[in-house]
UniProtKB/Swiss-Prot annotation:
It is found in: Secreted. It comes from Arabidopsis thaliana (Mouse-ear cress). May be involved in plant defense. It comes from the Eukaryota. Keywords: Disulfide bond, Plant defense, Secreted, Signal. One of its GO terms (biological process) is defense response. This is Thionin-like protein 1.
Length: 137
C-alpha cells in the first residue's frame, strides 16, 4: 500500500513539474526582464551590477518565440506533416521481404534513411528551451 502512495506522489510531482516548466516558458519580456534584473542585482559582483540592465535586455530579447506564443492562424503545419510523412514513407518503403539476403547493405541503407527521418522529425518538432543568464562579460 505504501509503495502505491509513493508511486502516485512521484507521478504527481512529475506532472506538476512539467506544468511548471510549461508556464515558465510562456514568460513575457517584462517578466523575464524583471526577474533577470532582480537575480542579477542579488548574484552579480558589485562591479558587474552596472551592466545588469544591458545583460538582461540581451538575454530576454534573445529568447526565441515558442510555437504556442505565435498566432495560431498564421501557422501552417501541413508542411511539417508532409516532411515527416515523406521521411517516414522513405524508411518504410525499404523494409520488405525481398531485402532479406542483403542484411549488411540493407542495414546501412536503413541507417541512412533513419538518420534522414530523424533530422526531418527534429526540424518539424517544436523545441523547448530554457534561457540561462550569463553574467560574464
Amino acid at each position: 500500500m505504501e509503495d502505491k502512495r509513493v508511486a502516485m506522489l512521484v507521478v504527481m510531482m512529475l506532472v506538476m513539474g512539467n506544468m511548471l516548466i510549461e508556464a515558465e516558458a510562456v514568460m513575457s519580456f517584462k517578466l523575464c526582464y524583471g526577474g533577470c534584473l532582480v537575480a542579477c542585482a542579488l548574484i552579480a559582483p558589485p562591479i558587474k551590477k552596472l551592466f545588469c540592465p544591458f545583460l538582461c535586455i540581451k538575454d530576454c530579447k534573445r529568447r526565441p518565440m515558442l510555437s504556442f506564443e505565435a498566432n495560431l492562424n498564421e501557422i501552417d503545419q501541413t508542411g511539417s506533416y508532409c516532411e515527416l510523412g515523406c521521411a517516414t514513407d522513405r524508411c518504410v518503403s525499404s523494409s520488405s521481404i525481398d531485402d532479406k539476403g542483403y542484411y549488411v547493405n540493407f542495414s546501412g541503407i536503413m541507417w541512412r534513411k533513419f538518420h534522414y527521418a530523424w533530422i526531418h522529425a527534429q526540424k518539424s518538432a517544436p523545441t523547448r528551451t530554457k534561457i540561462a543568464i550569463d553574467f560574464s562579460l
